[in-house]
């Protein structure tokens, strides 16, 4: 009998199904299932769970849980709400994700910093009115959280002259 690993998530049905399929293909010798599909006996046998934006309370029904593998970068809520030190909570660190997110933060910051919505409006109205230019060094950008994603975004903003 294959070991059972619940996939505990708070995703829309389409995304949950896609993740479930990918996980099952990647681990053919493991039965990936919803936590709601497990019997009381099976719940007691679970030592590993895979999660994606879960409600941490959903994991509390697994009395022998030892390892939680998060497919998402952020695990703060899990750490805050699961106080059992015997459970290892492991998160995904993807350097490419950090770079991609930092590029998006930089792009949107420049979009707003250089007042692109106003210029697009002028373009639609066939107008050209020069706007005041504010230097990046005069603009402060706040980042909520300096984990891997936030730190990379902050570094890119600093490299481009913004105060962070």
Residue map of PLM features:
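Phosphate/diphosphate ligand-binding glycine-rich loop within oxidoreductases
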Residues: 47-120
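Short gly/ser/thr-rich secondary-structure transition/capping motifs
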Residues: 28-35, 48-52, 121-129
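Rossmann-like dinucleotide/phosphate-binding beta-alpha-beta segment
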Residues: 131-164
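Phosphate-coordination loops involved in phosphoryl transfer and adenosine-cofactor binding
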Residues: 2, 86, 137-140
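Rossmann-fold NAD(P)-dependent oxidoreductase module
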Residues: 22, 104, 108, 152-156
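N-terminal glycine-/charge-rich "phosphate-binding" loop or analogous flexible N-terminal tail
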Residues: 1-46
């Amino acid at each position: 009998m294959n070991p059972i690993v619940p996939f505990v998530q708070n995703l829309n049905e389409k995304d949950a199904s896609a993740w479930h399929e990918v996980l099952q293909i990647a681990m053919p010798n493991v039965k990936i299932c919803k936590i709601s599909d497990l019997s009381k006996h099976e719940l007691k046998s679970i030592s590993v769970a895979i999660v994606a934006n879960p409600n941490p309370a959903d994991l509390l029904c697994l009395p022998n849980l030892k390892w939680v593998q998060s497919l998402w970068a952020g695990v703060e809520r899990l750490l805050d709400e699961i106080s059992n030190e015997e459970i290892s909570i492991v998160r995904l660190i993807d350097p490419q994700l950090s770079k991609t997110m930092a590029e998006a933060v930089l792009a949107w910051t420049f979009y707003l910093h250089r007042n692109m919505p106003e210029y697009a409006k002028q373009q639609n109205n066939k107008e050209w009115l020069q706007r005041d230019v504010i230097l990046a060094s005069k603009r402060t950008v706040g980042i909520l959280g300096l984990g891997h994603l936030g730190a990379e975004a902050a570094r890119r903003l600093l490299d481009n002259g913004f105060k962070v």
